[in-house]
């Protein structure tokens, strides 16, 4: 009888037919001695032997079976080495540890609570679980298939050196966490950040298995000035302008607090480094923010944003009372004070109150006689920048404000408003003494001086009196021969700006004064008045 060819690495006594391996009876015979098999064969021949039916998936247990300890790794009886030179693994698998020795068949049958493992599998790290929680033990027939059984354990057994190195590091880290006093020279508590050790003693809530204390409360007062809290609030050790806005570096609410950022030119101090940088642009004249439309430059980005709204016409700030819109929030705040009547800015000299700080500043210059804005052409000084701009239009001849009815233009907006009243024959300003009405408040003020004795201005050269100081100044130029207003086209000089304006119309051909009766136009208002008298004489 020829011996059947066996798979590589298996001994003859380990080979059984596939039918026997897949049935419970065949599995029992594989675990019996020769005498027991002969007795069973005789009983089968005589028909006296009855095979007890075994539920599928369970293995028979011998009477002397004892459950193994958790450390014991149960092995399959099909692949136990019979000789020292036995090799039952495919190429590429890691050799088994010499600590594993052949076991008796009694250890093959395990309780359902123990899971069957491969003899080549070893846990790589403490607590490693190769199976999912829902794993169920396989049936005996399934476990007897060596090829499928070995393929399940190949990935678990063939681990790379990097995985073993990571496992050793993980084990060392776990030991350090479990024994912080022995492993860590810093004596850091488990689960606590190193910076949290500075807050010990201030009521922090510990983590881990330590007893839970009261909830954390931020300390105040002198505790905030301790080095521990100083390090927590400024871990990089920044000071001054480098720190920027912060709780300790910035300005406190209410205008109080440290101001470590000092200007080296004027000595003014600031709570924030960015505010100091903006302030220094006043001394240097730097204007890094430039408008792309008109090329106007600004020292602050916020001023550029406000300026750009003049080009776009955007007015995002709207009054909830009257619906009037503004391009800047400060303008809206100033406008809302007109509804409430609030005037928080009071002059310390005369007690007069104003709704805006700029109005108060402008008023205070009347007490100090300060005139910081000077004209580069004639050297005349003004207390307001707007007054200087209006004056400069006299030299340039610019008239940006024009009347929508007759087309007459003016260098100042304040001059256009009373002119518009002349078309409506409106004269809202009335003299309380004589009842005479005027279209401008300034003209009424000049007229009122005629009723007050001693309120006139007299010329020291000829004794002529005037109701306005500006008229006296113009008169004095007739004695001195001064002609500060000069034409840019022909170079002719004049003592009054109004006379220069009339002269400009000779070069431009402008005739802004038009007769309503015949439509004839004139360059001067006096010529129009003289012409209108001809129509009035004809009506008579």
Curated annotation (Swiss-Prot):
User: Residue ranges under compositional bias (Low complexity)?
Assistant: 62-77
Consequence when changing residue 125 to A: No effect on protein stability
- Mutagenesis or variant effect for residue 160 to A: No effect on protein stability
Instruction: Tell me the segments the record calls region Disordered.
Output: 1-166, 239-258
Please give the residue positions where the record annotates the modification Phosphothreonine. Answer: 158, 284, 396
Q: Could you say which residue ranges form the zinc fingers (C2H2-type)?
A: 261-283, 289-311, 317-339, 345-367, 373-395, 401-423, 429-451, 457-479, 485-507, 513-535
Question: Which terms in the Gene Ontology molecular function aspect does this entry carry?
Answer: DNA-binding transcription factor activity, RNA polymerase II-specific; RNA binding; RNA polymerase II transcription regulatory region sequence-specific DNA binding; sequence-specific double-stranded DNA binding; zinc ion binding
Q: Where is the composition biased (Acidic residues)?
A: 34-53
Q: Which UniProt keywords apply?
A: Chromosome, DNA-binding, Metal-binding, Nucleus, Phosphoprotein, Repeat, Transcription, Transcription regulation, Zinc, Zinc-finger
Return the similarity comment: Belongs to the krueppel C2H2-type zinc-finger protein family.
Protein name (database record): Zinc finger protein 768
Q: Organism, per UniProt?
A: Homo sapiens (Human)
Gene behind the chain:
ZNF768
């Amino acid at each position: 009888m020829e011996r059947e060819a066996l798979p590589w690495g298996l001994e003859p006594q380990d080979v059984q037919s596939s039918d026997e391996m897949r049935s419970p009876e065949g599995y029992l015979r594989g675990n019996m001695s020769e005498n027991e098999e002969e007795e069973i064969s005789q009983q089968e021949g005589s028909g006296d032997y009855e095979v007890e039916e075994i539920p599928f998936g369970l293995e028979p247990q011998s009477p002397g079976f004892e459950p193994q300890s958790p450390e014991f790794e149960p092995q399959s009886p099909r692949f136990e080495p019979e000789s020292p030179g036995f090799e039952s693994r495919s190429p590429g698998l890691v050799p088994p540890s010499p600590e594993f020795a052949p076991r008796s068949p009694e250890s093959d049958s395990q309780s359902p609570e123990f899971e069957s493992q491969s003899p080549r599998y070893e846990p790589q790290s403490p607590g490693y679980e190769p199976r999912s929680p829902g794993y169920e033990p396989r049936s005996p027939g399934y476990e007897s298939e060596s090829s499928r059984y070995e393929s399940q354990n190949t990935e678990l057994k063939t681990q790379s050196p990097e995985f073993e190195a990571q496992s050793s590091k993980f084990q060392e880290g776990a030991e350090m966490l479990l024994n912080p006093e022995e492993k860590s020279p810093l004596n850091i508590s488990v689960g606590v950040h190193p910076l949290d050790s500075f807050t010990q003693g201030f009521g922090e809530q510990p983590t881990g298995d330590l007893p839970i204390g009261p909830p954390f409360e931020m300390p105040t007062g002198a505790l905030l000035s301790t080095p521990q809290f100083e390090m927590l609030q400024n871990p990089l050790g920044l000071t001054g302008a480098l720190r920027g806005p912060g709780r300790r570096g910035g300005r406190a609410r209410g205008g109080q607090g440290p101001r470590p950022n000092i200007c080296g030119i004027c000595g003014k101090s600031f709570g924030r480094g960015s505010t100091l940088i903006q302030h220094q642009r006043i001394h240097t004249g730097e204007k890094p923010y430039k408008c792309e439309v008109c090329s106007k430059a600004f020292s602050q980005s916020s001023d550029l944003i406000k300026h750009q709204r003049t080009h776009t016409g955007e007015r995002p700030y709207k009054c909830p009372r009257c619906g009037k819109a503004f391009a800047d929030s400060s303008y809206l705040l100033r406008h809302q004070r007109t509804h409430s009547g609030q005037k928080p800015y009071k002059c310390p000299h005369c007690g007069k109150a104003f709704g805006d700080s700029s109005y108060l500043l402008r008023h205070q210059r009347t007490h100090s006689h300060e005139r910081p804005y000077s004209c580069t052409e004639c050297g005349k000084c003004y207390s307001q920048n707007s007054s200087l701009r209006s004056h400069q239009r006299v030299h340039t001849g610019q008239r940006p404000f024009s009347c929508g009815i007759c087309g007459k233009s003016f260098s100042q907006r304040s001059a256009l408003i009373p002119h518009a009243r002349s078309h409506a024959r409106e004269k809202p300003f009335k003299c309380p003494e004589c009842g005479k009405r005027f279209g401008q408040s300034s003209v009424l003020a000049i007229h009122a001086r005629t009723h007050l004795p001693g309120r006139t201005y007299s010329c020291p050269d000829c004794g002529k009196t005037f109701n306005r100081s500006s008229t006296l100044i113009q008169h004095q130029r007739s004695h001195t021969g001064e002609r500060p207003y000069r034409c840019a086209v022909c170079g002719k000089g004049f003592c009054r700006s109004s006379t220069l304006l009339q002269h400009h119309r000779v070069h431009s051909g402008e005739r802004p004064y038009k007769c309503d009766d015949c439509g004839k136009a004139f360059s001067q208002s006096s010529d129009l008045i003289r012409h209108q008298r001809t129509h009035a004489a004809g009506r008579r």
